[in-house]
């Protein structure tokens, strides 16, 4: 870890983008800045100009090219000079932190001596220099410039440093004698990044020396001398100073040189051959000679040669990692060299023995059971009585369950015949590989061939170990491979070859293997859609990703990263095809898992290898002895148990081959890459080679890449591909050029791969649920958790700081502990950014005043708290290995005896010990734990954790095998899967396989013609693999699910080949791989320029155009082609749906337009049209479809008729077999669905009816003639529905707008391609792409060119489609905040929004149904209205803010877009939602009616003053208590109907006097006769509106106008004062004011700005009635404000009583109580009311009218008793506006009534209601017309319409006043009512429907109830009969007839498509309420239209 976490401390924002920390250290940039090269980019040019002017001003330098800019030499020189002048005393900060240092060592059981014991003088110079430079760096980034004139200079000793424009100037202080920069007065110049790298190099050296110093005291043998480190550094500086940049190539060889020395020390064990050593040293010498620095090199080599200890020498690794280290030996390679040993997979000897036996058993079973070539068994080792021997001699497999069977005995069975298989054979096949075959003699005679000598040496290294000459090898190989007998068995291996780690299946059991295969096939399919997600997160892939991503950077504009992933043809062929095949394929056949084992190195990870050719296996005694010896010594079990048994073979034989090849390959690739002179990185493992190249490019200001640059990069990329190809050819490796992917060619959703955000998160989430990565089988928890995370977060965010941190964490988890300290040529790189720390540093900023250039000299080390933290970082990291590979503690390790790999293991052991010791500073402990990802739950997991250096995350106790054994079955059976997505996924998988099974079940023979066709269109490579995998998966799954352990292998193999064969039928051709012709950038530019014209690139239609269709006569096709006006919709089912969805969403199907199908198409249609037999058959078949669905047995009859009509032999049709199977098996429907064979030209007629919808299409284009017929059928059926008979032509529906044509249609009609943006991406459907692009917002930068109105329109469209929050969007488009801007052009905004909504609706249809169905404007309008209502909350979120602003509202109202002006702003949520919905509906209607362009629609506007007059003025207490301001009442109109404009002011006052309003009620007297009981507690009513006291009561309902009608007659007195409590705006007072126009009135109503409008669209009384009717009679404007009418407050009650007393004390007062409980406890409210009434009773003659509504009679009585003020009798007043579903009535308590203490009993109340019901029924029987209201004047019609429409709205039907015309209303209800039922989606797009299209399950009782009500209305409207007996209405059946249409109640049609009946009679009361409200319709449509 870097001692100072620079990236944390340094903010990069102040640096120009071109010179950020991550700029490449190249000459090019500084050369461009300093005039030695022409600047390549505009940015660099501008930067250079600024630099020039600075130099002219301060240094009088005209020509920058005179300056010294060789940073390599300069920094080497500076380091030398500055180190010499440093003080030898180390700065105190290190020593101050001695304590954590000591406790750290204590935790390792090690005591540090006192600090005085150390000699610091070696460490001091670098340490102090670093401290100074770091201080300069931090200061330079803190200072804030205030003036352009100010300069900041920093000094480090005599050196002056200045930062200008991303470059650093170095010059010597004039007073100083030394000239550090060697260029006199002139400064030297380097890029900022070079300066940073220099500092990081110094920092690294400081640490190294400090470590060395500490180690010299604590453990001499561990570390090199500090002197030798310093000497190396000094020599290197000297070399660099002399040779400059080229010398870095020499430093690249530093590690190989160290390796050569190590090899000498460790001897041959280390595996380095002499010639290899000489090569490396030779290379170095040659290079040094060329650079004239041989002496420097020799001095370095001397220092190396002085090191005679392996341990200190090992610490020299990594000293120069920060130079561009060429990966010739990548870090991984070195680790592989070190991995010379590892622990065995199982430590327990018994487990070992068991595994061992299992393996032998696998081999032997294979021999005995399957083939005659089984070797002889030597059973002499077994005792004659052995059960095993007995069974083997009889040639049987022993029965494991037998009590006699002993697992151990297997171990001692021996082969007698076997094949030798040493590694050299592998090489011999290498040597016979095609590269060498060209020139074999040359090899044998030790001549030369096309291969590099270096590669040859590497090969020879292996050969020498086994053979004396190459000729021997070839001879041996031929002998082996020509001998048929012995080709099969055992392995002969040497210990040395078993040490390289590989990865693979280990001892996976069947279940996980099975899961694996299935997963891979799923992933294979998904990969095409989501390439990044499906990459598996194996070790290798993590490496790949880490590699590719770590080379990227977010703040480097001007560079493009091109990643190439090489795909080499038949790499390792030799391993796969020759040697490994013998063993692996036998294993594969044994297990029926064909491709699994046969891949390279996949079996060896966990196995123990048995060498059959060895001497006898150890006897039991020998075995036990070894075991005991090890146990006694406390050793782990050894790798080699006996002669011929090995564990720990990690990747084994193949691993070695691969290792050799990897190196060969690397040398080749590196050679090609060096020629390009571009910065590049290579990662290689085996044939996986990834190259990252960084290419500088010129970019536009907005970040786009110009066309010519793109072309240049592509050309460059291709050149590299070609040169790689020819270079690799020399090694006999052929590159598959077309599959060598470059990020330039890969685009996902049209974005280039090197854009960071490829996919939206949502898609990722969905995808990760669908993919189970193939590496997640390790254990079940991983497997499940992998689903949630995948790596989506990683790919989403590695381009930002947070992402990098996350990435770091993931890498840590994957065991890449050195990531945090990864050094590259740039120095250090960190994945972490901690904002808090950055903030802390930035907080202490200095400010400079004007004036002189200021010089800041910084003291040698400022004391900062930071030191402790850094030290802790350093210590914690050294626990896991510091950057140097140094250890700060002793290693009692004998390197000669064990491999270097143990060294690492040993370190981890020590780390573990330290962690468990408890001495460790907790902060260090935490750091280490987080680096290792130790689970917090348990510290004891440490032992597992540190087992293997490669995977620090094995934090689970059980090993994979155990977990899988335990849980695989469960997973397969879907138990214990909590993850819903996963469950669904596995279900889906099962379903898919089941479907395939069923479809393939009967295919015993394959039609040869079909077979031929298939073969010609199969893509060999892919399908071979896929078919095989699939077949294996099927077979395995059968096994797993049946638990059939006894299944013989022969049957298995047979099953598999059968699966393979049948599956072949289904293979089809993939569409060819295409790329986007036109880059996304271009597409977006085209789109942006075309905004407002509704086109993209000149061709995209607007949604309105795209919806228009025309009908065409199919016979005229040929003629119409030339007119460019005809097309066919060819939306197909998408692949991968389940049958249900496919059946529902199949669109129109049209054939594949290829040359062969054209004639077929015409033929099919002509046949359909002209041939009466065909017509008849088609008609029959379509009938048959519905019959089959309903399971009718008429089916056979119909088939007969069909065969007669079509003249074909029914027996030849596959459908017949389906019939038989169905009858025998699963019932008709299931059978037919399950076993129909694929659609093909021979049998399409049969399949027409019911199969195609179930077809699983293998690709989106698997279409043939059958689909055509389907299209015909659909049209035919539609035709039949309309015309009832077949005649004339079948019309084809087609798009009018030619720009809507798709590619295939254009080909078919020979329409030339015009310039347009083509989407040829395989991954997305063209229509969808069109939608998304059309709706995408253009870049903001393009907006200023538009006029503001179109910009606003555009914004509206975006609002509707983009779903972000409104505030965001507004600020996105207008730079000013919303408040200052107000809202521009709200009308345009809304119309744009409307357009967007229409489009959004179409798009949603497209997404849901896989097709965009073209629908007429009329039906579209209805569907949109429905759609808007369904999504109304969303609209409120999007455009709600318009309604918070009065000006916008007036503008909208003036244009007729907004229905009303609410009386208060801000609105409540409910008001807002409703308003937005209506406004949106209105906007869409406008757009549809004007075909998308909007014309302002003047609607009669209202006068400003009227609106003002009617604004609500909220009155405060002061107003009530005597402020004489005039008072305005509210203007309110809050209905949900969209075309009610604001109320006109001319309202005749006498309207309310009109007869129409006079409604008589029923009066019933209730007398108190029951003895009073003690107070019963109040039950809280469950129907109260809301328990939130903040919500104030509803506005006046229309209802209250009506239910109080006629009460005045019942009261029969003229009061002196009217008091209204509750009741919203007091509408309840209006009927009283009709009678008593002069009575003064007091309002104590809930009357307030925030007053809420009820959700169901209740109307509010026209305010003029209130204004004109009541204002003059207000008593001193006595209106109590809302909070005062809360009469649960005693003060409010007192105030009310005071007002009454003051005005009419002692007079007659009528009180109207309309209070609804809004959340106060019931008892409190009732007692407060009682208290109020009783007190009022004392001050005046009080008559009170109460609205009482309760759900039970008991509660009704209780309520009446609480308000009757001890009167003996009260009067109930009921009229038909009261609800009948609850006990609701007005209770009149008269003042003059006699008093009595009795109570009114429940029985009395119940009788009263019964009397009311009887009275109603008598009235109803008298005459139905008596109930009708006379025709109303228009004004009241409007009022009532609000009431009626709100009831309809409750039934999901939105009506406008235009619909209030008898015929239209009938039509609307008939047509739309069936839509309330959940028909299947077919109904959405087609006018026909079948009985079977109604899902019975989806119909709730509510929906049926709604249907009944609507049906009742229909009857009333059509025949004038308005039934009032709710009981009988509810019991009736509703019918739906063809169309589908609703029938009037009681009418039964001839053709019933559906009928519904309520299941329960509970809805009677609801019906009373609904119907009494709907009865008002009678007033609109009286009999005979009077």
UniProtKB/Swiss-Prot annotation:
Cell compartments where the protein resides: Virion; Host cytoplasm
Family indicated by similarity: Belongs to the rhabdoviridae protein L family.
Keywords (A to Z) from UniProt: ATP-binding, Host cytoplasm, Hydrolase, Methyltransferase, mRNA capping, mRNA processing, Multifunctional enzyme, Nucleotide-binding, Nucleotidyltransferase, RNA-directed RNA polymerase, S-adenosyl-L-methionine, Transferase, Viral RNA replication, Virion
Organism annotation: Infectious hematopoietic necrosis virus (strain Oregon69)
Quaternary context: May form homodimer. Interacts with the P protein.
Coiled coil: none
Organism phylogeny: Viruses, Riboviria, Orthornavirae, Negarnaviricota, Haploviricotina
Residues of the RdRp catalytic domain: 560-757
MF (Gene Ontology): ATP binding; GTPase activity; mRNA 5'-cap (guanine-N7-)-methyltransferase activity; RNA-directed RNA polymerase activity
UniProt KW Nucleotidyltransferase keyword: yes
Role: RNA-directed RNA polymerase that catalyzes the transcription of viral mRNAs, their capping and polyadenylation. The template is composed of the viral RNA tightly encapsidated by the nucleoprotein (N). The viral polymerase binds to the genomic RNA at the 3' leader promoter, and transcribes subsequently all viral mRNAs with a decreasing efficiency. The first gene is the most transcribed, and the last the least transcribed. The viral phosphoprotein acts as a processivity factor. Capping is concomitant with initiation of mRNA transcription. RNA-directed RNA polymerase that catalyzes the replication of viral genomic RNA. The template is composed of the viral RNA tightly encapsidated by the nucleoprotein (N). The replicase mode is dependent on intracellular N protein concentration. In this mode, the polymerase replicates the whole viral genome without recognizing transcriptional signals, and the replicated genome is not caped or polyadenylated.
Protein name, entry field: RNA-directed RNA polymerase L
GO cellular component: host cell cytoplasm; virion component
Catalytic function, reaction form: RNA(n) + a ribonucleoside 5'-triphosphate = RNA(n+1) + diphosphate; a 5'-end (5'-triphosphoguanosine)-adenylyl-adenylyl-cytidylyl-adenosine in mRNA + 2 S-adenosyl-L-methionine = a 5'-end (N(7)-methyl 5'-triphosphoguanosine)-(2'-O-methyladenylyl)-adenylyl-cytidylyl-adenosine in mRNA + 2 S-adenosyl-L-homocysteine + H(+); a 5'-end (5'-triphosphoguanosine)-adenylyl-adenylyl-cytidylyl-adenosine in mRNA + S-adenosyl-L-methionine = a 5'-end (5'-triphosphoguanosine)-(2'-O-methyladenylyl)-adenylyl-cytidylyl-adenosine in mRNA + S-adenosyl-L-homocysteine + H(+); a 5'-end triphospho-adenylyl-adenylyl-cytidylyl-adenosine in mRNA + GDP + H(+) = a 5'-end (5'-triphosphoguanosine)-adenylyl-adenylyl-cytidylyl-adenosine in mRNA + diphosphate
Binding residues for ATP: 1619-1628
Domain Mononegavirus-type SAM-dependent 2'-O-MTase per the UniProt entry, residue ranges: 1592-1788
Pfam families hit by this protein: Mononeg_mRNAcap (PF14318), Mononeg_RNA_pol (PF00946)
Enzyme Commission code: 2.7.7.48, 3.6.1.-, 2.7.7.88, 2.1.1.375
InterPro entries with a match to the protein in the record: Mononeg_mRNAcap, Mononeg_RNA_pol_cat, Mononega_L_MeTrfase
């Amino acid at each position: 870890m870097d001692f100072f976490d620079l990236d944390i401390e340094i903010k990069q924002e102040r640096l120009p983008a071109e010179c950020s920390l991550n700029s490449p250290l190249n000459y090019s940039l500084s050369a461009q800045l300093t005039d030695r090269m022409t600047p390549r980019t505009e940015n660099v040019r501008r930067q250079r100009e600024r630099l020039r002017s600075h130099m002219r001003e301060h240094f009088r330098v005209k020509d920058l090219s005179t300056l010294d800019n060789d940073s390599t030499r300069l920094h080497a020189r500076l380091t030398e000079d500055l180190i010499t002048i440093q003080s030898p005393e180390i700065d105190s900060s290190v020593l101050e932190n001695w304590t954590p240092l000591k406790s750290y060592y204590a935790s390792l059981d090690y005591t540090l001596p006192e600090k005085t014991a150390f000699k610091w003088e070696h460490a001091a110079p670098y340490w102090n220099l670093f401290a100074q430079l770091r201080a300069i760096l931090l200061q330079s980034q803190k200072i804030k410039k205030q003036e352009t004139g100010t300069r900041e200079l920093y000094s480090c000793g005599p050196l002056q440093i200045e930062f200008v424009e991303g470059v650093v100037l170095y010059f010597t202080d004039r007073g100083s004698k030394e000239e550090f920069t060697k260029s006199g007065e002139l400064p030297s110049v380097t890029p900022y990044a070079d300066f940073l790298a220099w500092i990081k190099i110094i920092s690294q050296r400081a640490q190294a020396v400090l470590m060395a110093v500490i180690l010299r005291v604590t453990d001499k043998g561990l570390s090199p001398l500090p002197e030798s480190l310093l000497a190396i550094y000094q020599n290197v500086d000297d070399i660099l100073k002399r040779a400059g940049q080229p010398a870095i190539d020499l430093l690249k060889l530093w590690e190989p040189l160290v390796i050569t020395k190590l090899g000498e020390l460790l001897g041959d064990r280390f595996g380095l051959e002499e010639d290899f050593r000489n090569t490396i040293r030779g290379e170095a010498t040659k290079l040094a000679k060329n650079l004239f620095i041989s002496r420097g090199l020799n001095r370095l080599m001397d220092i190396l040669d002085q090191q005679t200890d392996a341990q200190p020498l090992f610490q020299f690794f990594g000293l120069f990692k920060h130079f561009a280290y060429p990966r010739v030996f990548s870090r991984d390679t070195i680790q592989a060299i070190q991995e010379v040993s590892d622990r065995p997979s199982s430590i327990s000897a018994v487990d070992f023995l068991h595994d061992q036996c299992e393996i032998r058993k696998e081999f032997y079973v294979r021999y005995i059971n399957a083939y005659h070539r089984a070797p002889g068994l030597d059973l002499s080792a077994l005792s004659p009585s052995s059960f095993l021997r007995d069974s083997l001699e009889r040639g049987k497999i022993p029965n494991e369950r037998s009590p006699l069977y002993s697992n151990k005995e297997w171990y001692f069975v021996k082969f007698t015949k076997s094949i030798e298989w040493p590694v050299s054979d592998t090489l011999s096949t290498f040597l016979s590989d095609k590269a060498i075959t060209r020139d074999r003699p040359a090899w044998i005679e030790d001549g030369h061939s096309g291969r590099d000598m270096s590669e040859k040496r590497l090969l020879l290294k292996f050969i020498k170990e086994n053979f004396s000459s190459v000729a021997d090898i070839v001879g041996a190989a031929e002998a082996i491979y020509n001998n048929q007998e012995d080709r099969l068995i055992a392995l002969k291996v040497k210990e040395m070859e078993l040490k390289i780690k590989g990865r693979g299946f280990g001892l996976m059991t069947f279940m996980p293997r099975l899961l694996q295969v299935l997963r891979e096939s799923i992933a294979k399919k998904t990969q095409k859609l989501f390439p990044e997600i499906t990459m598996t997160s194996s070790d290798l892939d993590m490496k790949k990703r880490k590699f590719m991503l770590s080379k990227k950077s977010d703040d480097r504009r001007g560079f493009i990263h091109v990643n190439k992933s090489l795909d080499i043809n038949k790499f390792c062929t030799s391993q796969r095809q020759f040697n490994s095949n013998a063993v692996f394929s036998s294993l594969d056949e044994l297990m029926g898992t064909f491709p699994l084992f046969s891949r390279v190195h996949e079996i060896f990870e966990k196995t123990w290898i048995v060498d059959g050719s060895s001497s006898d296996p150890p006897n039991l005694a020998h075995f036990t002895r070894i075991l005991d010896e090890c146990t006694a010594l406390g050793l782990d079990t050894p790798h080699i148990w006996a002669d011929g048994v090995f564990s720990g073979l990690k990747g084994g034989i193949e691993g070695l081959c691969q290792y050799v090849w990897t190196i060969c390959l690397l040398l080749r690739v590196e050679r090609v890459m060096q020629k390009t002179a571009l910065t590049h990185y290579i990662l290689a493992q085996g044939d996986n080679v990834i190259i990252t190249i960084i290419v500088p490019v010129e970019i536009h200001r907005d970040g786009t890449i110009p066309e010519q640059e793109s072309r240049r990069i592509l050309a460059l990329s291709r050149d590299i591909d070609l040169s790689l190809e020819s270079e690799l050819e020399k090694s006999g490796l052929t590159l598959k050029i077309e599959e060598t992917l470059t990020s330039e060619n890969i685009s996902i959703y049209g974005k280039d791969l090197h854009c960071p955000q490829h996919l939206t998160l949502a898609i990722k989430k969905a995808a990760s649920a669908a993919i189970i990565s193939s590496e997640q089988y390790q254990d079940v928890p991983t497997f499940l958790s992998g689903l949630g995370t995948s790596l989506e977060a990683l790919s989403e965010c590695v381009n930002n700081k947070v992402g990098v941190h996350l990435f770091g964490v993931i890498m840590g988890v994957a065991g890449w502990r050195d990531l945090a300290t990864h050094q590259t040529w740039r120095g250090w790189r960190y994945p972490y950014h901690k904002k808090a720390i950055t903030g802390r540093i930035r907080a202490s900023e200095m400010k400079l005043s004007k004036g002189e250039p200021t010089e800041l000299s910084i003291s040698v080390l400022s004391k900062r708290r930071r030191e402790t933290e850094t030290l802790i970082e350093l210590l914690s990291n050294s626990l896991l290995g510091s950057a140097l590979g140094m250890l700060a503690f002793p290693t009692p390790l004998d390197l000669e005896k064990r491999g270097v790999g143990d060294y690492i293991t040993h370190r981890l052991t020590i780390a573990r010990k330290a962690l468990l010791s408890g001495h460790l500073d907790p902060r260090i402990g935490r750091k280490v734990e987080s680096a290792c990802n130790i689970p917090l739950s348990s510290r004891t997991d440490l032992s597992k954790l540190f087992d293997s250096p490669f995977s620090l995350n094995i934090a689970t106790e059980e090993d994979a095998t155990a977990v899988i054994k335990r849980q695989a079955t469960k997973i397969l059976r879907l138990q214990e899967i909590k993850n819903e997505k996963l469950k669904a996924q596995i279900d889906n998988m099962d379903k898919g396989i089941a479907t395939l099974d069923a479809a393939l079940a009967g295919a015993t023979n394959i039609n040869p013609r079909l077979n031929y066709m298939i073969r010609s269109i199969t893509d060999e490579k892919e399908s071979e693999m896929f078919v095989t995998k699939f077949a294996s998966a099927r077979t395995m799954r059968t096994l797993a699910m049946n638990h059939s352990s006894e299944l013989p292998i022969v049957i298995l193999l047979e099953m598999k080949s059968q699966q393979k064969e049948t599956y072949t039928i289904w293979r089809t051709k993939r569409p060819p791989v295409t790329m986007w012709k036109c880059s996304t950038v271009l597409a977006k530019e085209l789109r942006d320029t075309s905004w407002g014209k509704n086109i993209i690139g000149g061709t995209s239609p607007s949604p309105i155009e795209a919806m228009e269709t025309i009908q065409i006569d199919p016979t005229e096709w040929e003629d119409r082609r030339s007119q460019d006006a005809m097309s066919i919709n060819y939306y197909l089912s998408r692949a991968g749906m389940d049958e249900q969805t496919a059946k529902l969403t199949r669109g129109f199907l049209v054939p594949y337009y290829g040359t062969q199908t054209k004639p077929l198409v015409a033929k099919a249609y002509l046949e359909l049209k002209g041939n009466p037999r065909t017509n008849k058959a088609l008609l029959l078949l379509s009938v048959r479809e519905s019959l089959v669905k309903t399971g009718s047995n008429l089916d056979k009859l119909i088939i007969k008729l069909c065969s007669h009509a079509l003249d074909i032999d029914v027996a030849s049709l596959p459908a017949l077999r389906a019939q038989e199977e169905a009858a025998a098996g699963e019932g008709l429907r299931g059978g037919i669905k399950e076993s129909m064979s694929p659609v093909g030209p021979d049998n399409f007629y049969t399949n027409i009816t019911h199969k195609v919808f179930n077809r699983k299409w293998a690709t989106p284009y698997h279409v043939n003639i059958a689909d055509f017929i389907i299209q015909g059928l659909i049209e035919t059926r539609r035709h039949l529905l309309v015309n009832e008979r077949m005649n004339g032509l079948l019309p084809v529906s087609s798009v009018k707008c030619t720009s809507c044509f798709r590619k295939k249609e254009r080909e078919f009609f020979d329409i030339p391609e015009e310039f347009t943006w083509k989407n040829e991406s395989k991954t997305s459907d063209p229509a969808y792409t069109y939608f998304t692009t059309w709706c995408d917002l253009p870049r903001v930068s393009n907006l200023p060119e538009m006029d503001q109105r179109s910009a606003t329109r555009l914004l509206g469209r975006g609002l509707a489609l983009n779903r972000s929050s409104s505030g965001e969007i507004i600020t996105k488009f207008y730079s000013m905040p919303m408040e200052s801007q107000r809202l521009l052009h709200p009308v345009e905004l809304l119309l744009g929004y409307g357009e967007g909504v229409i489009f959004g609706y179409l798009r949603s249809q497209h997404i849901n149904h896989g097709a965009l169905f073209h629908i007429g404007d009329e039906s579209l309008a209805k569907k949109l209205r429905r759609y808007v209502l369904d999504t109304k909350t969303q609209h409120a979120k999007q455009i709600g803010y318009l309604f918070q602003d009065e000006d916008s509202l007036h503008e909208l109202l003036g244009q007729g877009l907004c229905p009303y002006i609410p009386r208060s702003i801000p609105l409540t949520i409910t008001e807002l939602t409703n308003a937005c919905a209506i406004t949106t509906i209105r906007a869409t209607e406008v757009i549809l009616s004007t075909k998308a362009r909007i014309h302002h629609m003047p609607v009669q506007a209202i006068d400003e003053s009227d609106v003002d007059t009617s604004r609500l003025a909220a009155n405060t207490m002061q107003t009530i208590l005597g402020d004489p301001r005039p008072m305005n009442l509210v203007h309110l109109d809050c209905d949900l109907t969209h075309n009610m404009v604001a109320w006109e002011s001319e309202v005749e006052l006498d309207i309310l006097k009109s007869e129409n309003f006079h409604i008589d009620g029923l009066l019933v007297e209730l007398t108190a006769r029951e003895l009073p009981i003690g107070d019963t507690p109040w039950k809280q009513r469950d129907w109260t509106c809301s328990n939130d006291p903040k919500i104030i009561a509803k506005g006046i309902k229309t209802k209250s106008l009506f239910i109080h009608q006629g009460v005045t007659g019942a009261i029969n007195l003229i009061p002196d004062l009217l008091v209204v409590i509750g009741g919203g705006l007091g509408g309840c007072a209006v009927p009283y004011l009709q009678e008593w126009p002069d009575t003064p009135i007091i309002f104590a109503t809930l009357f307030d700005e925030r007053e809420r409008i009820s959700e169901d669209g209740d109307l509010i009384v026209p305010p003029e009635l209130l204004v004109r009717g009541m204002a003059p009679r207000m008593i001193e404007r006595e209106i109590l404000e809302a909070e005062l009418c809360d009469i649960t407050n005693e003060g409010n009650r007192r105030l009310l009583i005071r007002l009454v007393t003051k005005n009419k004390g002692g007079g007659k007062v009528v009180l109207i109580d309309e209070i609804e409980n809004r959340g106060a406890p019931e008892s409190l409210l009732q007692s407060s009311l009682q208290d109020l009434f009783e007190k009022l009773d004392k001050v005046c003659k009080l008559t009170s009218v109460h609205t009482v509504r309760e759900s039970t009679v008991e509660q009704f009585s209780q309520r009446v008793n609480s308000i009757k003020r001890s009167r003996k009798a009260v009067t109930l007043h009921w009229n038909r506006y009261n609800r009948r579903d609850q006990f609701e009535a007005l209770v009149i308590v008269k003042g003059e009534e006699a008093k009595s203490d009795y109570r009114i009993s429940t029985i009395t109340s119940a009788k009263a209601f019964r009397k009311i019901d009887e009275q109603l029924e008598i009235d109803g029987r008298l005459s139905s017309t008596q109930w009708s209201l006379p025709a109303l004047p228009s004004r009241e019609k409007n009022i009532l319409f609000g009431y009626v429409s709100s009831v309809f709205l409750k039934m999901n039907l939105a009506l406008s006043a235009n619909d209030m015309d008898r015929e239209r209303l009938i039509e609307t209800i008939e047509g739309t009512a069936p839509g309330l039922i959940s028909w299947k989606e077919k109904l959405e797009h087609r006018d026909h429907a079948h009985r079977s299209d109604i899902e019975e399950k989806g119909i709730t009782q509510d929906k049926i109830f709604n249907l009944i009500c609507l049906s009742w209305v229909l009857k009333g409207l059509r025949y004038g009969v308005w039934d009032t007996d709710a009981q009988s209405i509810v019991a009736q059946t509703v019918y739906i007839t063809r169309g589908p249409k609703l029938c009037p109640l009681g009418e039964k049609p001839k053709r019933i498509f559906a009928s519904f009946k309520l299941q329960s009679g509970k809805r009677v009361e609801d019906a009373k309420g609904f119907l009494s409200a709907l009865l008002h319709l009678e007033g609109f449509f009286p009999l005979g239209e009077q």
